[in-house]
Each structure stands twice: as structure tokens, then as C-alpha cells.
Amino acid sequence: MVGSIVGSNMAATDARFLSSNFGNSFSINTRIHRFHDRSQIVIPRAQSSSSPSPSPPSDKKKTKTRPGTITTKESEETVAKKLDVAPPSPQSPPSPPTLKLDDVNPVGLGRRSRQIFDEVWRKFSGLGQMSRTTRPDEQETLDSLLIREGPMCEFAVPGAQNVTVLVVGATSRIGRIVVRKLMLRGYTVKALVRKQDEEVMSMLPRSVDIVVGDVGEPSTLKSAVESCSKIIYCATARSTITADLTRVDHLGVYNLTKAFQDYNNRLAQLRAGKSSKSKLLLAKFKSAESLDGWEIRQGTYFQDTTASKYDGGMDAKFEFTETERAEFSGYVFTRGGYVELSKKLSLPLGTTLDRYEGLVLSVGGNGRSYVVILEAGPSSDMSQSKQYFARISTKAGFCRVRVPFSAFRPVNPEDPPLDPFLVHTLTIRFEPKRQRPVDGLAGAQQDLRSFSLVFEYIKALPAGQETDFILVSCTGSGVEANRREQVLKAKRAGEDSLRRSGLGYTIIRPGPLKEEPGGQRALIFDQGNRISQGISCADVADICVKALHDSTARNKSFDVCHEYVAEQGIELYELVAHLPDKANNYLTPALSVLEKNT
């Protein structure tokens, strides 16, 4: 895998707002630019009277004066009155622009900067307080300070006021910074907390919508996801007890993704399936008639004459059982043999799969692995069709399997990549090779050459541009050695449930967290489990906020830490940005080189 190093430099004002002590301290630096170019201040010589009169010759030697310098006689009189240019005569050329002494006076500049600071601080200190009316002139002053001239103008995100973000774990070290960053950028923020008491209220701004709920209790999450557009999950177990890890890091993610999906499905139904997050239904197995059009085929990869003497044969069936389930089952005892279930897709008029990014299958069974095959080509000539395959694994019981189109590889290596626009046939194949027994005693007693696959539905996932769910996980570095495997097991289970949910996701695995200001050091983004250095909480929070609207962050998992000297043999890091300014988005070039759906 190829990682990337970027220089993370948050804006100076942002860093001061979100320092490691999470206080409300605010400071401002006003740079006073002194004017060293004397030619900008022009002091004209004294003009003669209107009636010309001959002047007596002077005995004094004329001294040449540099432009912009003031002779003793002229300076005392002119500066005492006004530092300005005399009105030009009709014959003289236009004079340069005037410059007041107060414009370059350091004391005056300091007073003006202090006034701007006091006005901004007064407005921000009133956030979350009782509302009051604002005079028009006062509102105009505030707009000029905050939008046109103020220090917060570069943090505003267009359309942020129309986006509601649910922050889970808002009182954690990362969550508190995430909430404040979202507020500064104009988002509507909801915070999910387990209990609402004075200590929790003091950790969050008053303008945050606080929702009481528990990720371990699905019934409490329905109201939390209402009206939410995106979710940032910063919660983590408070202990390394197995029950606590499972409840927060595994089931918590599963319960929240399910509640969010149910909410999106309700919206799609209200909008008659016209929601941008609506999936395309390819097949739903709810009756015996839904099995029409599916065809069972058998075949072998090669012929083995010796093994054919002991060939046990193969058989498969696809039926709607008495328990009202569509089950594809059978066995393959033939060496090199396979059985498959195939159907030609029938899409709604005007619909093509190029608008979607993959397939999601809701299936159950005995935990076998299968091969999903897509046939693509012109519908007028099926002989030109090409086959593309992707391997999937199932679990014992029901699960959702997500298969992105980018995971499909051509059967013939010389064929071009898959074009979803040309897909016309879907096939699911079982083959005995590469099968692994299911964990547990029941799995050890199963014959790996038999299979059972129960179908609920097959849908196409919409190709969204942005992520829906951001999960802050961990790399395992910094965790006690005797508890690391247990922690990582729960984290991986939560990540896996998010990937299978069908939501657009971003999984961030930071190194050991540090309490220090963000934006001070370069960051490393990697996908090779090689991260060992720490990272500040502010930097992780900044990545979460930037990933909300970054298309390169969708459906990606990555590790991140502060820059370090790579060990020999793992120097595969690419320098994609350095010394970025406030307007530079370091996340896009860093994530563009990483792989999706990992």
C-alpha cells in the first residue's frame, strides 16, 4: 500500500480557538506594517506668490535635496499644519494620493485592531445566550467584521447551515473539538450523550442540540438521527472489559448505522424513491414468483480423467421453502467443478448501473464464500460480452455483503475494466476451492463441499459524492499489550458492520492521542498497519470535519499519525503537500492515492 505525508496547517485563529486546554481563550496578532518607502510621502516645496517678483541672488550655496526628504524650514511649517499635498496648480501634473499620519501610526493601528477584537469577542461571547434584537447598523458592522474582514471568514463552509451533523461521543477528547469546529463553520450540531447533567452541559456549547441516548440501546437512537445528514462517531469504550467494548465499539456502530439507514429509507419512501440515497432494487425474494428467471448451471474448470473414476457428482437447487425463504443449496464433489445461479437483469426504463457504485446483497446461510460474476457487453450482440468477477464471504446467519464495482476483475486479463453501463447479467457461483470452515464446533463438522445460501434482496448502491458516516477507530498502538487484541477485535467488528451497512463511510484510525495544539506537524496517511507514532486530538478532529464534504474520503479506511522517520524498507510514502496555507485542503491529495473499500 502507498501512504502519503501531508503538512497539516490549520488556520492560526482556528488553532487558538481549539487549543489543547479547550478553553475559550482568544488572542489576535496584528502585524503593523511600517512604511519604509519614503517616496510615498511627498512634501512639496513652498509655492511662490501669484505676482512674480525677482528675487535677490542668494549668497548661500544651494544644497541638493533628495525626493521625499524635508528641509528644516519646510518640515516645521508643513508638518505642524497638516501632512498633506498642496493643491496642484492648473499647469502642474496631478499630485499622488494623500496619506494621513494616522494611517501609518503604530498606535492608531493598534487601537483599531483592538476595537475589531473587542467587537468580535463580544459577539462570540453572546452565542448561546438569550436572543436579542440587533440594530441594522450593528448587524452591518458584525457582517463586515466576521465576513469581509474578520478572522473567521475563511472557516465558513457554503451550505453548512443546511447540514445537521450528529456527533456521538461529543464529550470525548476528540468529540469536544469536533463540536467546536463544526460550530465555527456554521453547521447545525446534535450531540448524543448518555446522561444530561451539569458536568456534561458545561463541556458543550449551549447552542448544541443535546440528545440523550445510548448506542447500546437501539430504541433510543431513533430520535437522535432525525433530521441528521451526517454522523461523526467519536465514542469509545471507557474500559477494556469485553462487554463494554462490544456494546460501544461493535454493537454501538451497528445500531447507529441501522437507525440511520432506517431513517434514510423512510425519507426515500416519502419521496417516492427519488431520494439521492435510494438504492436500486434488482431482486427481492418474497414469493415463489420472484424466483422466475433464475437459472442453475453446472460446469468444470478442467477435466481430470483419474479423478472422474471417484467423482461424486454435483447438484444444486433454488427453491422457495416452506419457511418462505429463497434458498440456493447443493453440493459439489467433482474436482474442479462449480454450480451457479444466473439471471439476466431487467432494469427500469431509463436506468443504468453506471449511476451506482456497487451491489449490496442481504443473504444468510452456512458461511461459505462465493464468486459474483457480472457479464457486460452490447445488448445487441451477446457474443461480445465479457465476464468480471469478485469474491465475497458470508457469515453463518444473515448478513449484508457489499461488493463495489471497483472490486470486479476481468476473467480475461486482456479485457478492459468493468463498465457498469453495459452490465446485463448477474451470476452467483459456488466452488469448493478456497473454502474455510466456520469458527466453532459446528463449522468443524461441516462438509466444505456443500453450501446453503438464503436470499433476501439484491440492490445497487447509489454513487454518492460525500461520506455519510465518519468513524474514529484506532490502530492499536498505545493500548496495553495484554488487551490490544481484545480492543482491536471489537474495533474491527464495528468497522466491518459500517462497511456492510451500505452507507458512504470514512474510517479514521489515529495513532496514540496527544493533548497538544493541532496543525503543528505534518501528517502521515497510510493503509499498511505501519502507524506507530502519536497524533494530536485537534488534528484528528480537523480530519473529521474536512472529510465531511471531501469526495476522496468516501468509502476509505486509513491510518494517520504525525510525521516520523520511516524505518528501512517502508519508505513508500509520497510527499503530496508541504507548508500549506489556511486555504489549502491537505486531505484531498493525501487520500487520492489511497484505495477504496479496504
Swiss-Prot record:
Segments of this protein annotated with the region Disordered: 42-106
GO cellular component, one term: chloroplast thylakoid membrane
Keyword Plastid attributed: yes
Main location: plastid
Basic and acidic residues bias: start-end ranges: 73-84
Transit peptide: 1-79
The keyword Lyase appears for this protein: no
UniProt entry keywords in alphabetical sequence: Chloroplast, Membrane, Photosynthesis, Photosystem II, Plastid, Thylakoid, Transit peptide
GO biological process, one term: translational initiation
Mutant phenotype after disruption: Impaired photoautotrophy. Seedling lethal. High chlorophyll fluorescence phenotype and severely affected photosystem II (PSII) subunits accumulation associated with a drastically decreased synthesis of the reaction center protein D1 due to a reduced translation initiation (ribosomal loading) of the corresponding psbA mRNA. Plants lacking both HCF173 and HCF244 display stronger PSII defects.
Alphabetized InterPro entries for the sequence: Galactose-bd-like_sf, NAD(P)-bd_dom, NAD(P)-bd_dom_sf, NADH-UbQ_OxRdtase-assoc_prot30
Molecular-function annotations in GO: mRNA binding; RNA binding
Topology term for the membrane: Peripheral membrane protein
Bias type Pro residues, positions: 87-97
Subcellular location per the Swiss-Prot or TrEMBL entry: Plastid, Chloroplast membrane; Plastid, Chloroplast thylakoid membrane; Plastid, Chloroplast stroma
Protein purpose: Auxiliary factor required, together with HCF244, for the biogenesis of photosystem II (PSII), especially for the synthesis of the reaction center proteins (e.g. D1), via the regulation of the corresponding mRNA (e.g. psbA) translation initiation (ribosomal loading) and stabilization.
Family, similarity comment: Belongs to the NmrA-type oxidoreductase family.
Quaternary structure and partners: Component of a high molecular weight complex containing psbA mRNA, OHP1, OHP2 and HCF244, and PSII core proteins D1/D2, HCF136 and HCF173. Interacts with LPE1.
UniProt-recorded name of the protein: Protein HIGH CHLOROPHYLL FLUORESCENCE PHENOTYPE 173, chloroplastic
Organism: Arabidopsis thaliana (Mouse-ear cress)
